[in-house]
């Protein structure tokens, strides 16, 4: 297993340094697990491997221009060089990655390896995985120290379905990326491994909870990674870092073996530097192969049972056409422009109306002027590719947001945590109750009994959703009403999908106190942003994608989000590809090797 090397704050920084700088030092010098790697590979590989795509990499392998070992070592060297500053990767799997690379090199040298993609959609492709995604014999930290207690570690007994499918596709696992505790934050600070910085400016937030993966991928630590998304956690951080983040139709990709935040909302999907790589990775994540290009059901995730019948057929790369946007129509949701807001996890029907109204008001997220300008500018790329943008106050108005907000999932959270521990927990604990018996402390309410933000609101009783008589009123009925309105609006206005900003604000500077979004007051605390108004996608389970949409005046990225009807994932990827080919908005970050304070390690 990887051996972590811990770094602490240099004592010299604590004696003659202004308070603001000490706070920043705390961010930049929190514990981090990194492993030694060899000397940097020859610089001549930079031109071949920097920003390399999956098809380009496979071509290099086919022509024997590089070996898998060289490619893996090049990426490991970038992690060693830059990760101490950005802290995107919590654990490096150097030994395992090089062993796998050597095995693949022997296959390549044998002369009997099939051509790509028959040899595996991701054959020899370096990837990273998020810390809530189970890998056999590795600790699934879920970003939380409590799963790392000596003698009580959450050591995965087997791979998650996602990891098993990526292995089968030939991917090489380089490391595990940082994430906030339980994926329950809009930023990327973890009790287990500290803070991840934005690759475009380390002072700023990369967003969360997949901020570690997006920082690793945009920084060329790996070609691809996986993210998870309960309320925006693939899409929002992708927007901050000029990468492509994909939220599949729920049920297309299995979440079995991924530590849940809220199993009714959770999803997983690819994070990549371009749409083509995202489409290839998504195909692999569904269990597709070149010989059998159909999504596979996973017995451990019943929501995948009908994927093969409902999904668009074939590998998703076949939908990537430069002209895919011609004649398409996209509506802009009115409630997002108005900043109506949707409380995360919704509000169960059993919550009193007064408390529900107060919670809805607290969720208001005004769209910042700079984000509105960036969004309107990004729409020009859609128009240039042949699409029409429709603004209409009846397109998902604030009443839609209110319907969605009443699809409450909080009473059913513990059910998902229990199911995960039953199948992917260590020998010591296979349930919420087992964890308390084994460690002497309970699991936090976040994953066993969440409540509304208001401190005076009592916790909801945890129930099994299949047997709870209130489940229809709490969740199923409002979700279906919102989904019906989503589809009916598309039909009424002859729309193909929706387009909107992936966040309500630019990435915040985490070295400065932040203002509350809904009051304008100063909180005096570090950021919990950039905030997003896109958790409705999770409740509905429709597919959505974030693509690079340009940059703010300060040089930080803006992300454009597009959503489609359920199971139209191929169409959605095609639209994103067409937008990408017209705009070419992505520009990689310029990374630094020094901290923001003198002599920082």
Where are these regions (language model features)?
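Bacterial N-terminal signal peptides
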Residues: 18-33
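N-terminal secretory signal peptides that target proteins for export/translocation
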Residues: 1-17
């Amino acid at each position: 297993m990887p051996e972590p090397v811990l770094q602490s704050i240099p004592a010299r920084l604590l004696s003659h340094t202004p308070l603001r700088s000490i706070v920043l030092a705390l961010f930049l010098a929190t514990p981090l697990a990194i492993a030694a790697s060899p000397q940097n590979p020859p610089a001549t590989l930079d031109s071949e491997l920097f920003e390399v795509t999956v098809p380009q990499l496979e071509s290099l392998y086919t022509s024997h221009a590089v070996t898998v070992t060289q490619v893996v070592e090049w990426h490991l060297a970038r992690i060693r060089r830059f990760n101490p500053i950005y802290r995107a990767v919590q654990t490096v799997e150097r030994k395992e990655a090089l062993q796998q690379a050597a095995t693949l090199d022997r296959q390549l040298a044998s002369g009997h390896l099939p051509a790509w993609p028959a040899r595996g959609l991701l054959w020899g492709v370096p990837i990273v995985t998020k810390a809530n995604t189970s890998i056999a014999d590795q600790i699934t930290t879920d970003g939380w120290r409590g799963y790392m207690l000596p003698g009580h570690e959450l050591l995965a007994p087997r791979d998650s379905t996602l990891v098993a499918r990526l292995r089968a596709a030939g991917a090489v696992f380089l490391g595990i990326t940082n994430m906030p505790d339980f994926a329950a934050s809009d930023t990327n600070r973890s009790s287990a491994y500290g803070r991840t910085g934005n690759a475009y400016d380390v002072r700023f937030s990369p967003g969360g909870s997949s901020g570690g993966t997006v920082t690793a991928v945009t920084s060329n630590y790996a070609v691809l990674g996986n993210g998870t998304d309960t309320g925006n956690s693939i899409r929002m951080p992708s927007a901050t870092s000029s990468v492509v983040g994909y939220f599949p139709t729920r049920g297309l990709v299995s979440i079995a073996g991924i530590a849940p935040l809220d199993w009714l909302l959770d999803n997983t999907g690819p994070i990549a530097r371009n749409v083509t790589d995202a489409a290839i990775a998504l195909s692999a994540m569904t269990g597709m192969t070149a010989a059998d290009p159909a999504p596979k059901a996973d017995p451990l995730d019943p929501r995948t049972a009908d994927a093969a019948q409902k999904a668009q057929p074939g590998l998703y790369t076949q939908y990537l056409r430069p002209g895919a946007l011609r004649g398409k129509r996209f509506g802009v949701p009115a409630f997002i422009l108005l900043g109506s807001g949707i409380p995360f996890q919704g509000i169960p029907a059993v919550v009193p109306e007064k408390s529900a109204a107060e919670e809805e008001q607290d969720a208001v997220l005004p769209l910042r002027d700079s984000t509105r300008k960036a969004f309107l500018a990004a729409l020009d790329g859609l128009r240039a590719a042949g699409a029409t943008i429709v603004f209409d106050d009846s397109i998902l108005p604030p009443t839609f947001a209110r319907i969605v907000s009443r699809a409450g999932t909080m009473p059913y959270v513990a059910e998902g945590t229990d199911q995960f521990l039953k199948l992917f927990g260590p020998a010591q604990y296979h349930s919420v109750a087992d964890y308390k018996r084994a460690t002497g402390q309970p699991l936090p309410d976040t994953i066993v009994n969440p409540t509304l933000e208001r401190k005076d609101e009592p916790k909801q009783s945890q129930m099994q959703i299949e047997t709870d008589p209130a489940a229809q009123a709490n969740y199923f009925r409002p979700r279906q009403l919102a989904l019906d309105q989503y589809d009916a609006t598309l039909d009424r206005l002859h729309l193909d999908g929706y387009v909107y900003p992936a966040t309500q604000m630019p990435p915040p500077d985490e070295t400065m106190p932040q203002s509350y979004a809904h009051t304008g007051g100063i909180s005096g605390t570090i950021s919990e942003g950039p905030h997003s108004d896109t958790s409705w996608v999770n409740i509905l389970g429709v597919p959505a994608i974030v693509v690079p949409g340009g940059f703010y005046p300060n040089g930080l990225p803006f992300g454009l989000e597009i959503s489609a009807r359920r199971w139209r994932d191929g169409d959605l990827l095609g639209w994103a590809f067409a937008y990408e080919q017209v705009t070419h908005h992505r520009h990689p970050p310029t990374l630094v090797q020094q901290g923001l304070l003198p002599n920082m390690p």
